[in-house]
Amino acid sequence: MCVIIPPQKYGINGKLSYLCPEITLIECLPEREGKTRKENYDMSCILHIETSTKVCSVALSQEGHLIYHEEDFDGPNHSVRCGVMAEAALSFANSHAIPVDAVAVSSGPGSYTGLRIGASMAKGICYGRALPLIAIPTPQIMCVPVLLKHDDLPEDALLVPMTDARRMEVYAAVYDRSLREVRAIGADIVEAGTYKQYLDEHPVYFFGDGSAKCREVITHPNAHFIDGILPLAKNMFPLAEKAMMRGDFQDAAYFEPFYLKEFVALKSKKLL
């Protein structure tokens, strides 16, 4: 699904500005020759690539606006779709005379193959166009739509984005409402008491494609589940633009996604 949308400004200077209250817009922008920090930021356009789950998505943002996004929900065919979708986004930018200034990629954890495809695509574009690379942790990407759609969350709420792994295992992290890390990303075997230390003290919101299988296991009264949350490229831009302002870039030559676990190849059941 390709969507070209009118500008929507709800990023750095809008509804998500509280995600990083210590950063001011002007002070953190690098100066470039002939441009003030504000002028330089106004020109910045970022290509976003997200391939950590079965959904493949790309997006373009500029100055806190989401200007283009495309999503493919038809299953894990990233090797076919990712390049086509990225090229379509770059063509859109070119046709509107918008120079792309950086590439942001979802850094994991998630699908080993999906992450590898997305990282390879992002690195290739960065290398070919001499662009900086930005890496955004996948759990943080999932937090963005939650904070946008649920701005009435209690001040002491904790967010637990979950990516489905095998059986009752999930890749999860714990954040507060300002996306400060309460607990680092880890692989959790979900049982009734897995998050008890947080649930006893805070309302905790679970979401992501790994949360559905946890609903019947985690029955604490402080546990809340939010459906329909996936890591999508269109939700990367508030975080990517913060990284752009900070100059928080990766070395494209050596960047590797955060797989969390080593790849395990499944044995085919078919007789050779």
Across the structure, where does each feature detected by a protein language model lie?
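Short, positively charged and aromatic/hydrophobic N-terminal segments
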Residues: V3-I4, Y10, K15-Y18, T24-I26, ...
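Surface "functional belts" at beta-alpha junctions
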Residues: Y41-D42, H65, D74-N77, P132-P231, ...
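DPxDG-like acidic metal-binding loop motif
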Residues: A104-T138
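N-terminal beta-alpha supersecondary unit
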Residues: Y41-P109
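Acyltransferase
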Residues: I226-L272
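Stable alpha-helical structural segments in soluble proteins, enriched in small hydrophobic residues
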Residues: A89-A93, G128, V146, M236-M244
